[in-house]
Design a protein with these regions (language model features):
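N-terminal Rossmann-like NAD(P) cofactor-binding subdomain of oxidoreductases
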Residues: 1-121, 125-132
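Active-site-lining helix/loop region of Rossmann-like oxidoreductase modules
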Residues: 76, 92-185
Length: 185
């Protein structure tokens, strides 16, 4: 009752009044701070825990998919927790069933994904000719970190999965296609 939750908006962590407002938990959904050096700025401002809505590829972060490896949170002393990515959350339950029952030798992942804010809305010159195409009018093949992110959830699959993405001009949807070479048929 009558509790206030403060929201802030800043492109730099140092400009957020975290210590002044005695903030001990930050939920970061910016997608901007995915490396430990950037995330650690929160701790310098007095924050105790950071929950990030994207994978963090660092041993100092615990990447979780609820219902798959979320039990690890109970005994973890790590201060950076991630909710992985939308594609990782889609893949992890599928991979759990297949890996536990059939075993995965290697695999390929394709994610058909809606446009993201890293894309341009109009064709323009750029260093990546594919990402320079209009997100409104193009099917854009690009990279995905999903195969690498899955190995954070399933370390035994590190180096066994590869993947790519196709960005498509839809508002909010995703489809993931997986092909696996299995130990058992």
């Amino acid at each position: 009752k009558n509790k206030k939750i403060k929201f802030t908006n800043s492109s730099t962590i140092e400009n957020i009044p975290l210590r002044k407002n005695k903030i001990d938990l930050v939920i970061d959904c910016t997608g901007s701070f995915k490396k430990f050096d950037n995330i650690s700025k929160y701790f310098k401002e007095g924050v105790k825990k950071v929950l990030i809505s994207a994978p963090v590829h660092d041993d100092r972060a615990l990447n979780l998919v609820y219902g798959i490896n979320s039990y690890l949170l109970k005994n973890s002393d790590l201060d950076i927790i991630t909710g992985a990515s939308c594609t990782t959350n889609c893949l992890a339950p599928i991979i759990k069933v297949i890996e536990e029952n059939l075993g995965i030798i290697r695999g390929s992942i394709t994610t058909i994904h809606n446009s993201t804010n890293s894309q341009t809305i109009l064709d323009n010159p750029g260093t990546d000719i594919r990402r320079s195409r209009s997100a409104f009018n193009s099917l854009i093949p690009t990279s995905t970190g999903s195969a690498r992110a899955i190995s954070l959830i399933y370390p035994n699959l590190k180096g066994k999965l590869d993947g790519y993405a196709v960005r498509v001009p839809v508002l909010n949807s995703s489809l993931t296609d997986c092909v696996f070479d299995l130990k058992k048929s």
